[in-house]
Amino acid sequence: MKLVELIKNLTIELQDGPLDREISGIAYDSRRVKPGDLFICISGLKSDGHLFAGQAIENGAVAVLAERQLDTGGKATLLTTPDTRSALALLAANYYGRPSKSIRVVAVTGTNGKTTTTDLIKAILEEAGKKTAIMGTLYAQVGEIQREMQHTTPEALEIESFMALCREEKADYIVMEVSSHALQLQRVAEIDFNVAVFTNLTQDHLDFHQNMDNYRAAKLQLFQMIKEEKQNYAIINIDDPWAEEIFQAATIPCRSYGIKKRSDYQAGELKIDLDGSSFRLHYGDNSLMINMKLIGLFSIYNALAAISFALQEGIDPGLIQSALARVEGVPGRFEKVDCGQDFAVIVDYAHTPDGLENILQTSRELGKKRLICVFGCGGDRDRSKRPLMGEIAAKYSDFCVVTSDNPRSEDPHAIIAEIIPGMDKVEKSRYAIIVDRREAIRHAIHLARTGDLVVIAGKGHENYQLVKDQVLEFDDRKVAAELLRGKVK
């Protein structure tokens, strides 16, 4: 593709060099530049791409897009534009031929529940015979082709590349998790979404957004960017405190789901135990009984979001029932670890105050004898949620083991010291501090007796632990299983 074609509709402030150069690819990481590429200088959270333009040119870049004038030594065409991050989204879409226009794209956003909801939507669509791609926290996949993802929502270049692959594979739908980071950083700015699904909004990522107003504003962008076309709409959790604001901000028709408030798709007759959940869905003059292996009130909310979408798409109710009955669950989301012990062990990704409260409240309602919770808080992330999570853990648990999560560059002891004041607010609070996560899990399992429930929260599906600059092999599920096998013997 010629450079002049690639930059169509892009605001160019300065041009130094020819526009008839042939562009063979786009890169924003100088280490990945190949001969013939356009290199886009992105000012990131940790580094500035403008500092690596010279390296990109040495690696073969024939054009550079920047926010300020740079010396290319006459070896590459230099273009400047006000915002290279939004430019990356535009040029990636141009380069790959805007694949989202030819596939129905469903965006799922919210603090908690995105991964499970996308998984359930995919299961229902596939039950209905629709070829469905998925993109999210765990991976991106279409058919048998799977790509690992570095972020919940990757950079625009990776998104458009994957969507182009989905177009080649003739996918009918792409269901993707859309994070607040992606919305604020313009990663999805050029995608033609058809449906937006809202799960909930609670405190998270304030290390990035600074406050809840900014976090909320980032989420709202999704409901304002979808084109007002006949087949486009939003699905909203009406029980969430922020629902009304989304209804008012949305530029497309909205449908609601819920349990507590009157909604278009409403669940009643709820039953939850360690074998699964069931409920009756009421919509219009119709009702539908849903039985599934997923556990918890939060799982019912996720299922409601997926069902509401499916019914809006005109999918047969019987197919919805059979799809949900078969779903085993998402790795690391309220996942049982069973080695024949006479007490229950659950691993969950809950790493926000609301997420932790959801799983502990559900665990408490399961009616087991004692609830033992192992948890910590991530380093280099929103510090204000640490005492909140401590208070929640102490409120619902009979005993807590406070430990490391992913401490990153922070001292694990310092993180725990910010958790404890929240726990001390709870009069009945009982806890132990064991910084080593493996030993913390060992202690919780050692304490467990017949009929108890141990919840290991925070890391879920993750198979690593981030300590300083190291990525250590660590999987809560494997560690728990190994320790349980030792105890059962």
Swiss-Prot record:
The keyword S-adenosyl-L-methionine does not apply. GO terms for biological process: cell division; cell wall organization; peptidoglycan biosynthetic process; regulation of cell shape. It is found in: Cytoplasm. It catalyses: UDP-N-acetyl-alpha-D-muramoyl-L-alanyl-D-glutamate + meso-2,6-diaminopimelate + ATP = UDP-N-acetyl-alpha-D-muramoyl-L-alanyl-gamma-D-glutamyl-meso-2,6-diaminopimelate + ADP + phosphate + H(+). ATP binds at residues 110-116. Meso-2,6-diaminopimelate binds at residues 381, 405-408, 458, 462. Carboxylation is probably crucial for Mg(2+) binding and, consequently, for the gamma-phosphate positioning of ATP. Keywords: ATP-binding, Cell cycle, Cell division, Cell shape, Cell wall biogenesis/degradation, Cytoplasm, Ligase, Magnesium, Nucleotide-binding, Peptidoglycan synthesis. GO terms for molecular function: ATP binding; magnesium ion binding; UDP-N-acetylmuramoylalanyl-D-glutamate-2,6-diaminopimelate ligase activity. GO terms for cellular component: cytoplasm. UDP-N-acetyl-alpha-D-muramoyl-L-alanyl-D-glutamate binds at residues 30, 152-153, 179, 187. Its cofactor is Mg(2+). Gene3D superfamilies: Mur ligase, C-terminal domain, Mur-like, catalytic domain, MurE/MurF, N-terminal domain. Catalyzes the addition of meso-diaminopimelic acid to the nucleotide precursor UDP-N-acetylmuramoyl-L-alanyl-D-glutamate (UMAG) in the biosynthesis of bacterial cell-wall peptidoglycan. Belongs to the MurCDEF family. MurE subfamily. This is UDP-N-acetylmuramoyl-L-alanyl-D-glutamate--2,6-diaminopimelate ligase. It comes from Syntrophomonas wolfei subsp. wolfei (strain DSM 2245B / Goettingen).
